[in-house]
């Protein structure tokens, strides 16, 4: 095991092969990079990814002021997103004493969270602002969140996923008074490896393009699998991809 190495910074895939003598490399770096909306104000103090918010609260005990990793609990919190992780973040913030809103651009029928997760969130007192989409996070003079601009949405024709596409309702702009915004929009592969590896093809979601049967990528000697290829998925699929990649590498090295 070689720790404290960041592929793409400390070294690169090309260096592993050309300089360090590795004959094959398997990329299983996952899809842990939180997604953001790309709206103004996202860098303000008080904006968190759901991953960071939940990790700091649960693993680092940030809810306890005596610990070294405190986190401002917030009194008026908006969670952007509608998945199971969004429900976790909303219920955590609620239990820390905040008024919490789930902000989701589609209707309740399109919520990706499990029905029971939505039920429990409502039961605890989370407010659901559906058919609502943020356009800007408002920031005070000290760089802290003070609110959020939103627009109301309505459902139009189905998109490529089969769900009806949200369309902005003209003249529906409004503001929410907030001190914390939690982004729960899913995760994607970190592009650091792919952007520093010439000849390694990725798709439009920045996932590495690899053969499902053996993990082979577009770069000779480089194999990949798991969430780095599929996007965020399940452990069992990642395990299967690892086995397929091992088989592919064995066959590749056997022919050399």
Regions found by a protein language model. Name each.
Residues 1-39, 136-149, 154-157, 180-182, ...:
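Feature captures the FAD/FMN-dependent oxidoreductase FAD-binding
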Residues 225-256:
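A conserved FAD-binding loop/helix module that cradles the flavin
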Residues 82, 105-107, 139, 227:
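Cofactor-binding loop segments of dinucleotide-utilizing enzymes, especially the Rossmann-like FAD-
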Residues 62-98:
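Rossmann-like NAD(P)H-binding beta-loop-alpha module
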Residues 1, 90-136:
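Rossmann-like dinucleotide-binding cores of NAD(P)H-dependent redox enzymes
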Residues 43-74, 158-232:
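FAD-site-proximal beta/loop scaffold in flavoenzymes
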Residues 6-11, 54-56, 108:
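Short acidic loop-to-helix transition motifs that present clustered carboxylates
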């Amino acid at each position: 095991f070689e720790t404290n190495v960041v592929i793409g910074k400390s070294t690169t895939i090309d260096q592993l092969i050309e300089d360090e003598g590795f004959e094959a490399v398997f990329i299983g770096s996952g899809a842990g990079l939180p997604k953001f909306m790309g709206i103004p104000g996202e860098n303000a103090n008080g904006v968190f990814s759901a991953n960071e918010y939940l990790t700091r609260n649960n693993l680092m005990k940030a809810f306890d002021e005596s610990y070294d990793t405190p986190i401002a609990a917030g009194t008026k919190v908006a969670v952007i997103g509608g998945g199971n992780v969004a429900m976790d973040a909303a219920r955590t913030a609620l239990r820390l004493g905040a008024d919490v809103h789930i902000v989701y651009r589609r209707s309740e029928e399109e919520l990706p969270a499990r029905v029971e997760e939505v039920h429990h969130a409502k039961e605890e007192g989370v407010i659901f602002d559906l058919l609502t989409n943020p356009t800007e996070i408002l920031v005070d003079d000290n760089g802290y969140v003070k609110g959020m601009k939103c627009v109301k949405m309505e459902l139009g024709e189905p998109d490529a996923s089969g769900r009806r596409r949200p369309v902005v309702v003209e003249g529906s702009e409004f503001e929410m008074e907030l001190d914390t915004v939690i982004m729960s929009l899913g995760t994607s592969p970190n592009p650091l490896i792919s952007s520093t590896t010439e000849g390694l093809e990725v798709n439009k979601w920045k996932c590495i393009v690899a053969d499902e049967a053996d993990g082979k990528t577009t770069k000779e000697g480089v194999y990949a699998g798991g969430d780095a290829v599929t996007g965020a998925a399940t452990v069992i699929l990642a395990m299967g991809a690892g086995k397929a990649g091992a088989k592919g590498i064995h066959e590749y090295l056997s022919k050399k």
